[in-house]
Swiss-Prot record:
Reaction equation(s) it catalyzes: (sulfur carrier)-H + L-cysteine = (sulfur carrier)-SH + L-alanine
Protein name as annotated: Probable cysteine desulfurase
Underlying gene: csd
This enzyme's EC code(s): 2.8.1.7
Cofactor requirement: pyridoxal 5'-phosphate
Native source species: Methanothermobacter thermautotrophicus (strain ATCC 29096 / DSM 1053 / JCM 10044 / NBRC 100330 / Delta H) (Methanobacterium thermoautotrophicum)
Length: 400
């Protein structure tokens, strides 16, 4: 098999012709083969899935199932363990709202999580759940020992983000999963920043649940995501929404739910989006996830070395334990001003602000100053782009 090179991928993404795109942690530009797969659906078999017996419906239904199987294979799961969602946030909320929590249960969550893996758990306090927030170290690393100190026989669930969206720190998700299971707790991994950047094997890390986006590392379309729910724990979860496609039978007296995952997918899905997601998994496999990870490690090292060497710049996160993401600030400049200058002077796209992770910013005493500038990479980024970022940042730092 001939794997795709970085230059091959760049040719497939027209947006990269005019922009240095360093915001993969937010979303990624869509390759043409993914766009073509979605366009084919709209042009050739634009019909609803599972609702009818004519040929267009059957083709659309088959394509959607193929996409589910591709997604499952990519994370070493079975297709009947995959629930399609609109994003990672919805996937996490399905678990937070669908588990049968009782007063006195506890949940353990780190303090540097994205809001999507923090707010749903905080809200459980309204139901009498003890939400225990574990502090990361100054580099953004969650010490498994602190998780171990926080769990006990009341712990219903432990959750952690694989890679911090704010700092890029990589957590020991396998060890944290072991700790959760040792006390009989369920385990959820937010894999929003790791999927498509490195191998994510849900069975190897011991996840009962894992939440994923389609539009970040996997280069899929926006409006797509998915929840992995292990067959072993599917009986623990109740659907948040009911409607078309979720029931086997209904009467005036009640209803009988469909099996997993159909009972969690109420109404018409984003069919074109998920067909595009299936195409993006094909695209990932054409590149090779190990090649992506090797390139990502190289780019991360170059990114940190380049940016951290500039006078007046402070970088955040443990440099020995980050991947794909670098947060930094220049002197006392507002992060949004830095991002605007990068865009206007060099066409460089980066994120600025709190990154939907205000507790993480408060942990680093960066909340009041507006957060950080964040650069994040993927397989399509090059050493030349990192060099341009460094040169432009040097010019900006010289303004201060």
């Amino acid at each position: 098999m001939i794997f795709m090179r970085t230059e091959d991928v760049r040719r497939d993404i027209p947006l990269l012709r005019d922009h240095v795109y360093l915001d993969a942690a937010s979303t990624t530009p869509t390759p043409l083969p993914v766009v073509r797969a979605m366009t084919e659906y709209f042009k050739e078999y634009n019909a609803n899935t599972g609702r009818g017996a004519y040929s267009l419906v059957l083709r659309a239904t088959r394509k959607l199932q193929e996409a589910r199987e591709k997604v499952a294979g990519f994370i070493n799961a079975s297709s009947d363990e995959i629930v399609f969602t609109k994003n990672t946030s919805e996937a996490i909320n399905i678990v937070a709202g669908g588990l049968r929590f009782r007063k006195g249960d506890s949940v353990v969550v780190p303090n540097i999580e994205h809001h999507s893996n923090f707010l749903p758990w905080l809200r459980l306090r309204e139901r009498g759940v003890d939400v225990r927030v574990v502090k990361a170290d100054e580099g953004g690393v969650v010490d498994p020992g602190r998780i171990e100190d926080a769990v006990d026989e009341t712990t219903r669930l432990v959750t952690v983000t694989h890679i911090s969206n704010a700092l890029g720190t990589v957590q020991d998700v396998k060890e944290i999963g072991r700790i959760a299971h040792d006390v009989g707790a369920l385990y959820l991994v937010d894999a929003a920043q790791s999927i498509g950047h490195m191998e994510v094997d849900v069975r190897a890390i011991g996840a009962d649940f894992a939440a994923f986006p389609g539009h970040k590392g996997t280069l899929g379309p926006v409006g797509t995501g998915f929840l992995y729910c292990s067959t072993d724990v599917q009986g623990e979860l109740e659907p948040l929404m009911l409607g078309g496609g979720t029931v086997l039978d209904v009467s005036e007296d009640g209803y009988v739910l469909e099996d997993f995952p159909a009972k969690f997918e109420a109404g018409t899905l984003n069919i074109a989006g998920f067909i595009g997601l299936g195409a993006s998994i094909d695209y990932m496999n054409r590149i090779g996830i190990r090649r992506i990870q090797k390139h990502g490690m190289k780019m991360t090292e170059e990114l940190h070395a380049t940016v951290s060497s500039i006078d007046g710049i402070e970088c955040y996160g443990d440099p020995q334990n980050i991947y794909g993401i670098l947060s930094f600030n220049i002197n006392n400049m507002d992060p949004h001003d830095v991002a605007k200058i990068l865009d206007e002077t060099a066409g460089i796209c980066v994120r600025s602000g709190h990154h939907c992770a205000i507790p993480a910013m408060k942990h680093l005493a960066l909340h009041e100053t507006g957060g950080t500038v964040r650069a994040s990479i993927h397989y399509y980024n090059t050493s030349e782009e990192i060099q341009l970022l460094g040169e432009t940042l040097e010019e900006i730092a010289g303004m201060g």
